[in-house]
């Protein structure tokens, strides 16, 4: 963390500059009675400088996570840094995925050994819940003991720790550099101090029958449609104020997908429930639970429970879906 | 039809196959028999592959790649001499813009070099060949990889390279895409405007077709060469390497929608093969079918596509 400490000391002159700006104006006599516009200008200038240096500190913090080398691989080139404004420069068409969570910054660092390279991406999020959310979208691979949770497969290590999501990739798609990749991952993980806290909503998913690594956490419609396309329209009124968890279930011979959405209040939840029943299930409401036969001989279900809306998809058994929904409400 | 007009399309519509039927057929959800069998002029799409065009470390054999491209151009233009086909399409009077992709699964450099050498053979002046992605531009062979220049965008949001060009070649990568379903030749034009964010919408990016229907592109784009050496069949644009596979081919055509429909069928079949069950793209790439039905930019009906396949046939997936 030496870079971080170096950077912290560099903030001190900034504060002095801020003070100096104000006092210089006093000396010129222009502000013997300071006017509001000048004061505002100074405040804006100071705020911008503080924001700028906060960004520098954060970027240096992120850069300090990277070790100089791992096995035969050494850092090559300068790390590239992206924020919410320029993430498109790195991930055109992919940036929206990260912006759908509370993404703050990304640092990309290449490591080289001869002509081969490994790319490390460290995504910093505002909350550990959102870092978990991003991680949860693709948990395929073998479990490895790195960070709060990690998987490795075919040259890609992904892990979540604290407010960070880390991806380490060898594009060959094989395991030729697995040792270097895992070594890098362990080093980076050790440099991230606090452990993360998974979203509380996750605990509401029943454990019985939950397919391992199938649980997802998200907020917005574009993520839902990537996991399970429902509609081009936002029928469930998903947005940054909603939290949702989704999991795949194997219950005896029955598969289904379970989606739980938590809304800010009961009226919004009710509106979403009614909208879904009317416009997707195309059925009239009678109570807080609906099960409707849809295409391919499958059943979709919905149950409103105060601020929470439970939904099931892909079930082939109407009765079992009803029982499943009924038991959910008891949780 | 304006770019921002909203579409209402649900999973249930999709499974019924009553709306955007051609998409349902391409994804294997609807029988091809539901499509019209009327005899009409068919759009030609060419697939050409070679098992040895890249080695186990994905190093491209440029000699094999050159022959592969020659075969593709001959088949596309219906002439045994590929140079004649290039000359039919481009001349010394042209300023040619080559739109590549540099994102995540980038267009192979070897393909860019081969296109350059063929354009030169067709008589196009080296300094009249622009290669670009977003606002990184190279002029002439000396800058074809470094793309050191920036030419900016016009008021209508299109790249100034498009404005300068008399002819365009679209050379995208081939990948699935988490927000648009799939990203082939139509979506590649999102890298030619400065308001791409307006097309990356939560309705499955339904309006990409507006780009290819725009006269700036529709009237100038003379050739599409989809780089299918190592496509991505899940996720994207960010790559999980386990979902890359060596298809070892290119797909050529003149009609964006037809090329993308063929590419979509291949990606969907690869997904089904991988999972050993139907594994439909999420979200569905509505923009391909809508480029046909809404924007009239080409055909998404497989029955109206004349598909010519040559070279390595194992695993061609269509």
Indicate where each model-derived feature is located.
Chain A
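Intrinsic disorder/low-complexity segments
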Residues: 1-50
């Amino acid at each position: 963390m030496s870079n971080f400490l170096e950077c912290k000391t560099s903030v001190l002159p900034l504060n002095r500059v801020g003070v100096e700006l104000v006092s210089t104006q006093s000396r010129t006599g222009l502000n013997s009675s300071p006017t509001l516009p000048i004061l505002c200008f100074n405040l804006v200038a100071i705020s911008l400088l503080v924001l700028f240096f906060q960004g520098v500190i954060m970027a240096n913090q992120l850069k300090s996570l990277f070790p100089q080398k791992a096995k035969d691989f050494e850092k090559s080139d300068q790390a590239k840094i992206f924020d919410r404004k320029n993430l498109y420069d790195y991930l055109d068409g992919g940036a929206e995925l990260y912006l759908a969570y509370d993404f703050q910054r990304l640092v990309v660092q290449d490591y080289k050994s001869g002509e081969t390279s490994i790319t490390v991406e460290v995504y910093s999020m505002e909350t550990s819940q959102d870092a978990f959310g991003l991680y949860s979208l693709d948990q395929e691979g073998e479990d490895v003991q790195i960070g709060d949770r990690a998987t490795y497969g075919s040259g890609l290590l992904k892990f979540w720790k604290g407010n960070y999501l880390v991806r380490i990739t060898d594009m060959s798609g094989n395991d030729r550099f697995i040792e270097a990749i895992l070594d890098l991952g362990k080093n980076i993980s050790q440099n991230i101090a606090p452990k993360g806290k998974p979203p509380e909503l996750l605990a509401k998913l029943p454990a019985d029958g939950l397919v391992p690594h199938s649980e997802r956490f998200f907020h917005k419609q574009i993520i839902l449609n990537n996991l399970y396309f429902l509609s081009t329209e936002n029928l469930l009124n998903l947005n940054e104020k909603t939290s949702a968890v989704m999991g795949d279930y194997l219950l005896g011979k029955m598969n289904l997908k379970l989606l739980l959405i938590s809304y800010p209040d009961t009226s919004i939840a009710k509106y979403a429930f009614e909208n879904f029943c009317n416009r997707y299930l195309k059925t009239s409401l009678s109570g807080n639970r609906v099960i409707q036969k849809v295409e391919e001989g499958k059943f979709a279900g919905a149950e409103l429970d105060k601020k929470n809306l439970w939904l099931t998809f892909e079930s082939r058994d109407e009765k079992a879906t009803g029982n499943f929904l009924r038991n959910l409400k008891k949780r | 039809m304006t770019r921002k007009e909203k579409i209402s399309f649900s999973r249930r519509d999709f499974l019924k196959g009553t709306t955007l039927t051609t998409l349902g057929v391409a994804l294997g959800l609807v029988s091809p028999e539901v499509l019209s069998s009327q005899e009409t002029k068919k759009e030609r799409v060419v697939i050409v592959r070679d098992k040895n065009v890249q080695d186990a470390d994905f190093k491209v054999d440029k000699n094999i790649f050159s022959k592969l491209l020659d075969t593709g151009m001959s088949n596309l233009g219906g002439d045994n001499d590929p140079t004649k086909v290039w000359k039919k399409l481009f001349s010394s009077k042209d300023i040619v813009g080559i739109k590549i992709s540099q994102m995540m699964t980038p267009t192979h450099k070897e393909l860019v070099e081969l296109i350059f050498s063929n354009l030169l053979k067709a008589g196009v002046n080296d300094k009249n060949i622009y290669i670009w992605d977003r606002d990184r531009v190279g002029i002439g062979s000396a800058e074809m990889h470094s793309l050191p220049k920036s030419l900016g965008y016009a008021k209508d949001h299109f790249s100034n390279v498009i404005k300068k060009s008399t002819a365009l070649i679209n050379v995208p990568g081939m990948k699935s895409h988490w927000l648009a379903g799939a990203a082939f030749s139509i979506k590649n034009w999102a890298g030619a405007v400065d308001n791409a964010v307006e097309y990356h919408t939560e309705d499955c990016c339904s309006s990409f077709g507006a780009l290819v229907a725009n006269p700036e592109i529709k009237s100038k784009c003379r050739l599409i060469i989809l780089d299918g050496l190592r496509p991505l069949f899940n996720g994207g644009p960010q790559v999980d390497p386990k979902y890359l596979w060596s298809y070892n081919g290119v797909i050529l055509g003149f009609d964006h929608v037809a090329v993308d429909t063929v590419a979509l069928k291949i990606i969907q079949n690869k997904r089904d093969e991988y999972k050993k069950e139907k594994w439909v793209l999420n979200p569905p790439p509505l923009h391909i079918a809508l480029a046909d039905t809404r924007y009239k930019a080409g055909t998404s009906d497989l029955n109206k596509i004349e598909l010519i396949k040559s070279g390595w046939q194992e695993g061609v997936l269509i």
